[in-house]
Amino acid sequence: MSEKSIVQEARDIQLAMELINLGARLQMLESETQLSRGRLIRLYKELRGSPPPKGMLPFSTDWFMTWEQNIHASMFCNAWQFLLKTGLCSGVDAVIKAYRLYLEQCPQPPEGPLLALTRAWTLVRFVESGLLELSSCNCCGGNFITHAHQPVGSFACSLCQPPSRAVKRRKLSRDAADIIPQLLDEQIEQAV
């Protein structure tokens, strides 16, 4: 019978606490720590005051392809890949740091971030398994999440070519410098 390291267990508890505070689901905690399911549930209840949410994790790449989700996922993924390439961190530590950068850079609505930590972690797994990748936009040059093996030079991001429903959803700014270009864009669209 092998003895568990007290130091490793303390690290796992600290990691689990950090992940829970960032909104991780139980499946992510089980995958990234060596703590038992029972201990993770007790820790989750102690920190959040309620049991962890039940249900399956997202398993489709389609969520990351819709326009607004793609922008958020791409921001996170670019931060994650930068951290990996520079060697500043790796593994789940890179996911946590990239997610914190994403939260700092994207103003969050009251109902919470568009890209939850568990979904960001799922994105990393999709990228690592080759289902998704970052492709360069042929208009702006930015790197955005696409399905794997996107033909080079054929991708235009949803910032350069937003879907029509994205334009309808946009609200006019109160700042006069912003209103004039928005009104001109809408007049051109109506004329066409």
Swiss-Prot record:
Binds 1 zinc ion per subunit. It holds the Pfam family FlhC. It comes from the Bacteria. Signal peptide: none annotated. UMPylation of FlhC by YdiU inhibits its DNA-binding activity, which inhibits the expression of class II and class III flagellar genes, and interrupts flagellar synthesis. Switching off flagellar synthesis facilitates Salmonella escape from the host immune system. Its main location: cytoplasm. Disruption phenotype: Double knockout with flhC decreases invasion of host cells. Functions in complex with FlhD as a master transcriptional regulator that regulates transcription of several flagellar and non-flagellar operons by binding to their promoter region. Activates expression of class 2 flagellar genes, including fliA, which is a flagellum-specific sigma factor that turns on the class 3 genes. Also regulates genes whose products function in a variety of physiological pathways. NCBIfam families: PRK12722.1 (NF009365). Belongs to the FlhC family. Heterohexamer composed of two FlhC and four FlhD subunits. Each FlhC binds a FlhD dimer, forming a heterotrimer, and a hexamer assembles by dimerization of two heterotrimers. YdiV binds to FlhD which inhibits the ability of FlhC(2)FlhD(4) to bind DNA. This is Flagellar transcriptional regulator FlhC.
